[in-house]
Amino acid sequence: IRDIFDSEITKQLSNRIQHEVISPFEYSLFKNTGENLNTRFKRYFFARVEGFLADELKTSMRQTYDDLVTKTGSVTGFHIEHILSHNDESLSHFNGDEELFLLERNRLGGILLLKGKDNISSSNELYVNKLQTYAGTLLWNETLREDFYKSNLDFQNFREKYKLDELQGMNKFNRESLETRQKILFKIASQIWS
């Protein structure tokens, strides 16, 4: 059944973009993913990433799939967090081009899930301050923090197993960092849905 599904989806993708698609998992199709997805799907996507990381790191998820995907309240709900706040520092990484900035910051590599009040408190912070907010939250969020990698042998093994050398702490977050995170998510999604 998987072969039939892959065949049909590649045919549909080819028709839609007017270009032959060889595989349903091509980075060119994933590169700009984010803005075009509804919020619940984004939460589902990151819940699956979180579950994959937890399994690979031989630990339990910090939140359940149900909580990550369905809870939306201001106290216990999970919300989309933009790593790049809408401020002058973030905009400067895009040479002041606000349209480009808004497109880029909404890609999957530029967002995470944060619990209600954490998300509200980090809303317009500078990136260096956001890193503190990400401590102790979800595993995917913590991969931005350098201290997450210290003495974390399971994570080192995970990076080697999936050839994710670029997955490392980021003391600054700019356009290149966002692209790196997008590529990492593509590799992880390819593993989850392969």
Language-model features: locations:
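Long, cytosolic, alpha-helical-rich C-terminal regions that act as interaction/scaffolding modules
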Residues: 102-107, 111-194
